[in-house]
Every structure is written in C-alpha cells, then in structure tokens.
C-alpha cells in the first residue's frame, strides 16, 4: 500500500517503521489540538477524535499491526468519547459527517480491528442511550 505512494517501489521495514513513528506523532498532535474543542466538535468524525482514531487504527493495522500500546490508546480515546457524549446537553446532531452517527460508525469500524476488547457492546450501549434521549 505505501509502496504505491512512492511510485510502486516497496518500502523497507525500516522505512515503514519511520513512517509509522511520524504518523503516530502527527496523530498525537491532532488529538492534542482536538482536546481544545467543545465536546460536540471534539467527537465529530470529520474534525475530531473519532476520525483521527479511525485513520490511526487502519493505517497502523495496514503497516504492521496495532501494538498493545496502540490498542490501549484507542480504548482510552473511546472512553473519552463516552464521557464527552454524557456532556452533550440537549438534542445531538446525528449526521454522519460531524454528528454522533459518524462517530459511532467510526468507533464500530475501529472495534472490528480489536475484537478481543468487545468495544462493539459498549458502542451499541451508547447508541441506545442516545436513542432514548
């Protein structure tokens, strides 16, 4: 996959490792930026943590897999998502781009990469809580 970006030339393991480290640093920067947003924006798929987390999970999975540390970070971000959902008062935007539906969909796709962690059950629980609002 990454070789296509470089004109069809395969990357060495060292080059992939360098890419992964740079990518992780960029993700951490983006997450710190998103931490300054209000909960609605912080948890939007298009500009917030769920979209960043989804890119993080799938790029790392495609370039060597998710380490235990990566998985722990994703779970931590999901727990923050749950906390932020509780902070959103009143009707919630449920659109796919910048609303809760897109965020839940992103977390569900991430959960597919982490089947042993059973995040799907938590996601369904959050969706049900929102439905009952």
For the regions a language model picked out, list residue spans one by one.
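Glycan-recognition and catalytic cores of secretory/periplasmic carbohydrate-active enzymes
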Residues: 1-133
């Amino acid at each position: 996959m990454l070789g296509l970006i470089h004109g069809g030339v395969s990357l060495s393991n060292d080059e992939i490792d360098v890419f992964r480290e740079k990518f992780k640093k960029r993700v951490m920067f983006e997450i710190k930026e998103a931490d300054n947003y209000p909960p609605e924006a912080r948890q939007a798929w298009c500009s917030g943590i769920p979209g960043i987390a989804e890119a993080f999970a799938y790029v790392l999975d495609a370039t060597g897999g998710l380490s235990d540390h990566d998985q722990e970070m994703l779970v931590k971000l999901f727990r923050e998502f749950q906390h932020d959902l509780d902070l959103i008062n009143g009707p919630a935007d449920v659109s796919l781009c910048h609303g809760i539906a897109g965020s839940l969909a992103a977390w569900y796709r991430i959960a597919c990469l982490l089947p042993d962690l059973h995040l799907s059950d938590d996601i369904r629980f959050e969706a049900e809580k929102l439905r009952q609002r």
